[in-house]
Amino acid sequence: MKVILLENLRRIGSIGEIIDVKRGFARNFLISNKKALYASKENIAEVEKIKSELSKKDTEKKKEAQKISEQINNKEYEIKKLSTENKELYGSVKPTEISKLILENDKLDIKPSMIQPITEIKSIGKFKVKIILHSEVDSEITINVVTADTIQ
């Protein structure tokens, strides 16, 4: 199925590009999230008209992502979790918890889908976490997991 991209997407394409993708990916992800349009003659003409406007919006999003990246890049956050004597956690640290932690500390709204732990966080220690803020901008933070004395 041919679609026209409305955003720059990593490993997929850039704004205004006509690409061929599987039908399910187009319907369930690209079109439903307003990242692409069906490649009809009318849509191609419409995208050509608004291509410069779309690239300006993308540039603004990129600048905003770079500002956020400068604020949180290489920063360390501490989270307290219950653990065993072997320093293993009861459960794990999820992206939603990391998102709430960043919101509480820096007042930045980072969606859990942007957060990608490099390794699964299931024990006490320091872990690197990658945050993808834009298709061209990402940041790395450190999560320091310490033992909690009581249940929170």
UniProtKB/Swiss-Prot annotation:
InterPro entries: Ribosomal_bL9 (IPR000244), Ribosomal_bL9/RNase_H1_N (IPR009027), Ribosomal_bL9_bac/chp (IPR020594), Ribosomal_bL9_C (IPR020069), Ribosomal_bL9_C_sf (IPR036791), Ribosomal_bL9_N (IPR020070), Ribosomal_bL9_N_sf (IPR036935). The keyword S-adenosyl-L-methionine does not apply. Pfam families: Ribosomal_L9_C (PF03948), Ribosomal_L9_N (PF01281). GO terms for molecular function: rRNA binding; structural constituent of ribosome. GO terms for cellular component: ribonucleoprotein complex; ribosome. One of its GO terms (biological process) is translation. Keywords: Ribonucleoprotein, Ribosomal protein, RNA-binding, rRNA-binding. It comes from the Bacteria. Belongs to the bacterial ribosomal protein bL9 family. Binds to the 23S rRNA. This is Large ribosomal subunit protein bL9. It comes from Pelagibacter ubique (strain HTCC1062). The lineage of its organism: Bacteria, Pseudomonadati, Pseudomonadota, Alphaproteobacteria, Candidatus Pelagibacterales.
